[in-house]
């Protein structure tokens, strides 16, 4: 739910950082 990056990249799949979701190509806080 925010534009804050989580420091993890993703390719359409889940993010492993807690509280983060995939917003290709990076994970962002929900």
UniProtKB/Swiss-Prot annotation:
It comes from the Eukaryota. The lineage of its organism: Eukaryota, Viridiplantae, Streptophyta, Embryophyta, Tracheophyta. Transmembrane segments: none annotated. It holds the Pfam family Cyclotide. There is a cross-link at residues 1-30 (Cyclopeptide (Gly-Asp)). The keyword Aminoacyl-tRNA synthetase does not apply. Probably participates in a plant defense mechanism (Potential). Binds to and induces leakage in phospholipd membranes, particularly ones containing 1-palmitoyl-2-oleophosphatidylethanolamine (POPE). This is Cyclotide mela-5. The keyword Disulfide bond applies. Disulfide bonds join 6-20, 10-22, 15-27. Keywords: Disulfide bond, Knottin, Plant defense. Belongs to the cyclotide family. Moebuis subfamily. GO terms for biological process: defense response. The presence of a 'disulfide through disulfide knot' structurally defines this protein as a knottin. This is a cyclic peptide. Contains 3 disulfide bonds.
């Amino acid at each position: 739910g925010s534009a804050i990056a989580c420091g993890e990249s993703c390719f359409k799949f889940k993010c492993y950082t807690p509280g983060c979701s995939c917003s290709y190509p990076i994970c962002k806080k929900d």
